[in-house]
C-alpha cells in the first residue's frame, strides 16, 4: 500500500508525491489533524477553517481521479501504525517541510518509525529550500533551477484502497478552538489560489510596485496568495511559471508598441518577493534555533528582562495611541491579513518603541497571520527587531507612516472609528489636538482614544542608543560575519550594514 501524506501541500497539480505514488499501486491519500499543532500557540481557528475548505476541495479533486481523502486525528506515527497494521505500508510519500519545532520533532519520529517498520519514506522538494546546505554559495542558482522545472501534471487516475474508513472533516470546536469571528479576505482551496493568481497577473497587479506599501491600496494591489502558498493550495513553482509567461507576454506587447503601464516593474517586484520567500525559509532550515533564539547571539539579554506585559497587551488589541499601529492591528485581527510594510511597522514598533523582546509578539502575530510560515515569519521578525546583526536597523515612525501611507485617513478611520471625526491633519498625532479641537472632533484623548503609550522621539532615541551600544562592539561584528556566512544573500554586498533608517520605512 502507498500512503501519500498531505501536509502543507493541499493540491493535486505539481504534487510529485501524488504523481509518483499513483504509479505504484493502491494508494491512501492521508491527511492527519495533528493535535499538537492544533493546540499550539501559533494555531488559530482561521487557520483551521482555511485548511478545512482546502481539504474539502482536495477531496473532491481526488474523487474525480478515482480516490478520496482519508482523514484522521492524532499523532502521526500512531496513525501510520494503525494503517500499517491494517494494510502494510510499502512507501510513505510526502513533501519536505521546513516548519516549526513541533513539525521538526514530528518528522524525526516519523523517520524513526519508518526505519523501525521497514517502510520507505520518500520526500520531495516543493520550494527552493535546500536541505543540509553548508553555505549560501550557489543557493540562488539551485533555487532558480528548481523553479524552472516542468510543472508536474495531475495523475490520470489513482487506485484507491477501498476498505478503510474515510473519516471526516473536524470542526474547530472539536479541538476546543473558539468560533471564528473573523471575516477572512481569502478562502482556501486550489481553485481560489489560481483565481487569485490570474486576477493578479492580468488585472490587480498592474501597480503592485507602487501600491503594495499602503494598507489603503494593498488589498487589491497585492497578490494575496501568501496563505494559499503556505498551505500548499498552489506551489511557488506554479506561480513562477505563470509569472514568466506573463512577463514574456508583456515584453512582447511592448515590442509591438502597445502600452504596458506599470506591468514590467510590478512583475519584476513580485518576482523578487517570490525569491525572498525561499530565501527566508532557508534561514530556518539552516538554523532551526532562530525560532526561539536571537539569530545573532550578541543581542542576547538586550530586551528579555524589560518585557512589559501592559505595553504588549495594548499593542495586541490596537490601543497604543498611535493610529496607524492601532488600525493595522485591528485590521489584522479582523481579517487575518495585512500587507508586508505594515507587518514590518508593527514588529518595529513593538521592538523599538515598546522595547519588547521579539518572541512573544512573534507568536501573537503568527496566530493572526493566516499565511503564517515559520521560516519566513521568525526570520522577518528578527530582521525587523534588529537581532540578526546584519540588516539595516529600521525604526519605523508610526507618525510618518500615516502621512506616507494613509494621508486622508481612509484606512485609519475604517478600523479606528473613534477617530472618524478627527481632521486629517491631526491623524498622525491626534493627542496634539487642543481641547477645542477634541471637542469639535468628538474624540477626547484619554477617554475615547488613548494617549500615546510612549513618546515617539524619546522611545526612538533610547532604542537607537541601546541597540547601537551592542552593534559597535567588536564581538558583535565578529558574530555578524558568522551570520552573513551562514545566511546572507550572495546577490549583493555581504558586509554587515551600519545604517539606521527611521523613516524609510
PLM ranges: what are they?
Residues 1-271, 281, 388-505:
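Active-site "lid/cap" and pocket-lining segments within catalytic core domains
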Residues 224-425:
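Active-site-proximal binding-pocket segments
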Amino acid at each position: 500500500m502507498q500512503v501519500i501524506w498531505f501536509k502543507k501541500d493541499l493540491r493535486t497539480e505539481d504534487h510529485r508525491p501524488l504523481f509518483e505514488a499513483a504509479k505504484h499501486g493502491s494508494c491512501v491519500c492521508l491527511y492527519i489533524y495533528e493535535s499538537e499543532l492544533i493546540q499550539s500557540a501559533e494555531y488559530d481557528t482561521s487557520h483551521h477553517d482555511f485548511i478545512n475548505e482546502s481539504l474539502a476541495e482536495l477531496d473532491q479533486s481526488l474523487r474525480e481521479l478515482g480516490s478520496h481523502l482519508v482523514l484522521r486525528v492524532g499523532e502521526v506515527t500512531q496513525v501510520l501504525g494503525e494503517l500499517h497494521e491494517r494494510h502494510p505500508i510499502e512507501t510513505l510519500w510526502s513533501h519536505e517541510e521546513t516548519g516549526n519545532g513541533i513539525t521538526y520533532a514530528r518528522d524525526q519520529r516519523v523517520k524513526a518509525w519508518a526505519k523501525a517498520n521497514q517502510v520507505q519514506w520518500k520526500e520531495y522538494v516543493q520550494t527552493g529550500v535546500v536541505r543540509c546546505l553548508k553555505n549560501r554559495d550557489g543557493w540562488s542558482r539551485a533555487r532558480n533551477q528548481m523553479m524552472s522545472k516542468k510543472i508536474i501534471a495531475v495523475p490520470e487516475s489513482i487506485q484507491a484502497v477501498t476498505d478503510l474508513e474515510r473519516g471526516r472533516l473536524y470542526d474547530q470546536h472539536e479541538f476546543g478552538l473558539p468560533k471564528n469571528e473573523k471575516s477572512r479576505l481569502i478562502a482556501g482551496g486550489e481553485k481560489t489560489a489560481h483565481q487569485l493568481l490570474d486576477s493578479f497577473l492580468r488585472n490587480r497587479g498592474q501597480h503592485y510596485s507602487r501600491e503594495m506599501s499602503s494598507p489603503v491600496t494593498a488589498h487589491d494591489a497585492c497578490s494575496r496568495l501568501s496563505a494559499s502558498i503556505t498551505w500548499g493550495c498552489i506551489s511557488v513553482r506554479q506561480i513562477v511559471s505563470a509569472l514568466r509567461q506573463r512577463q514574456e507576454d508583456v515584453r512582447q506587447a511592448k515590442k509591438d508598441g502597445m502600452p504596458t503601464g506599470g506591468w514590467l516593474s510590478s512583475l519584476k517586484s513580485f518576482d523578487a518577493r517570490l525569491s525572498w520567500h525561499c530565501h527566508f525559509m532557508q534561514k530556518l532550515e539552516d538554523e532551526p534555533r532562530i525560532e526561539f533564539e536571537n539569530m545573532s547571539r550578541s543581542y542576547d539579554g538586550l530586551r528579555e528582562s524589560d518585557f512589559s506585559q501592559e505595553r504588549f497587551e495594548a499593542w495586541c488589541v490596537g490601543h497604543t495611541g498611535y493610529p496607524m499601529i492601532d488600525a493595522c492591528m485591528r485590521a489584522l485581527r479582523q481579517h487575518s491579513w495585512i500587507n508586508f510594510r505594515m507587518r514590518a511597522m508593527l514588529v518595529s514598533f513593538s521592538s523599538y518603541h515598546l522595547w519588547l523582546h521579539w518572541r512573544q509578539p512573534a507568536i501573537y502575530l503568527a496566530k493572526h497571520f493566516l499565511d503564517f510560515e515559520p521560516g519566513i515569519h521568525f526570520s522577518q521578525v528578527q530582521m525587523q527587531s534588529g537581532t540578526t546583526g546584519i540588516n539595516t536597523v529600521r525604526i519605523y515612525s508610526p507618525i510618518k507612516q500615516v502621512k506616507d501611507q494613509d494621508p486622508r485617513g481612509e484606512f485609519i478611520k475604517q478600523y479606528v472609528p473613534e477617530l472618524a471625526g478627527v481632521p486629517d491633519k491631526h491623524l498622525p498625532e491626534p493627542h496634539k489636538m487642543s481641547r477645542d479641537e477634541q471637542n469639535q472632533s468628538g474624540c477626547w484623548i484619554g477617554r475615547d482614544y488613548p494617549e500615546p503609550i510612549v513618546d515617539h522621539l524619546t522611545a526612538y532615541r533610547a532604542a537607537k542608543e541601546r541597540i547601537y551600544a551592542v552593534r559597535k562592539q567588536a564581538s558583535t561584528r565578529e558574530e555578524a560575519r558568522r551570520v552573513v556566512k551562514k545566511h546572507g544573500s550572495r546577490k549583493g554586498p555581504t558586509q554587515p550594514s551600519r545604517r539606521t533608517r527611521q523613516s524609510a520605512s
